[in-house]
Each structure stands twice: as C-alpha cells, then as structure tokens.
Amino acid sequence: MATQEYLYEAPPGLYLSEGEVGMNKRIHIYYSGSVQGVGFRFTAESAAQTLGVTGWVKNLEDGRVEVVCEGEEAALNKFLDKIKDIFGGYIRDARIDPEKATGEFGGFDIKF
C-alpha cells in the first residue's frame, strides 16, 4: 500500500463500507511540527481512553510523534478530530495510513 500525505483528513479507505459496521480499523499516524514537549502524548492517551481507542503513542528522535491505534470508525474519527482541535496549531503535517486491525492492544499506552 502506498503511503500518502494527509493534513488532518482521514485517508480514503479509512471509512467503513456497508458490510463492515462495527468492525475495528487501524491507523498508523506520523505527526510533524512542534508536537513534542506540548503534552501531545498524554492528551492522545487521555482522548483514546475516553473514546475506547486502543494502541500507543511515542515521540520519535526526529521530532515527530508516532501513533498506532485501533477502534471503530466513529471513535477513530473522533480521536483524529480531538487531536486536530487541541494541537492543530502545532501540527505541520499528519501522515495517516490505514492498516489491517490486529486486535493486539488491550488499552492505549505511551511508549518511552
């Protein structure tokens, strides 16, 4: 699957088709900009836990923040919206790639 750039928009294919209602999706996100040292990871963790989204978030050495998360489409879209609403002024770009959900996560964690 080719990687594409998306600024605050869910990529095509993230949205559920008619036969997939209730099935979990997975997205892999790289946020760039001034996204470290502003409470991004802790806010992402709180938003994910509130919405029932599972996965993890971590700072990368190159200054980006990486997020892998799974959940129902509506919850993932609310998660993306929450991050955009709070950190939109800090985010220069967001690369969002849909992936196949694995169900491997029991919660949402901050990786250090």
What are these regions (language model features)?
Residues 2-112:
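Intrinsically disordered, low-complexity, mixed-charge
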